[in-house]
From Swiss-Prot:
Cofactor note: Binds Fe(3+) ion per subunit.
NCBIfam families named among the record's database cross-references: protocat_alph (TIGR02423)
Protein's name according to its UniProt entry: Protocatechuate 3,4-dioxygenase alpha chain
Subunit composition and interactions: The enzyme is an oligomer of 12 copies of the alpha and beta chains.
Gene3D superfamilies, per the entry: Aromatic compound dioxygenase
EC supergroup of this enzyme: oxidoreductase
Organism superkingdom: Bacteria
Gene this chain is encoded by: pcaG
Amino acid sequence: MTTLKQTPSQTVGPYFAYGLCPQQYGYDLKSLFTPTIAAPHADGEHVLLVGQVFDGDGNVVSDAMLEFTQVDGAGRFPASRDDVAKSGFTGFARVGTGTDAQHRFVVETVKPGRIAADEAPHINVTVMMRGILTHAFTRVYFDDEAAANAADPVLNLVPAERRATLVAKRDAQPGRPVVYRFDVRMQGPDETVFFDV
């Protein structure tokens, strides 16, 4: 019997635009997922999660792709397609940074609730981009959830001086949507904390 070797890894990209986010990039193909997690009729506090991905030299990455997974405002994942259709909440978004003139990701969602009593509201993020051999996992916590963040078991695994790299900053201005700013830094002194999952 022949023993086969594992297929070698290669950098993840630049297939994203055409294969995973075609509508966002203007291709005549339907995207399976969009940057919208919560439709306008979904329950909860509607917010925008906005940010950029920076490489190790501090340059904005124009061709990264990010995926976001979260619960709704009540701490629940959608249970079925019917649940998604009725609630307007998918729990998942995919967005490329090349779809915005400033190379930002902009996700329309609702602020997540708690999944469990000891977990702070958060959004799971997967980052894929050129130059990395596998995707990177991180989380977004919220700066206006200080008490919940202080008790979160996952956030408490991170050294205190690094936790700020996981916390989105709220920007609420009258008459405008609430925005949480969260930048992903792939390397360097302010590198975002990534999880080995």
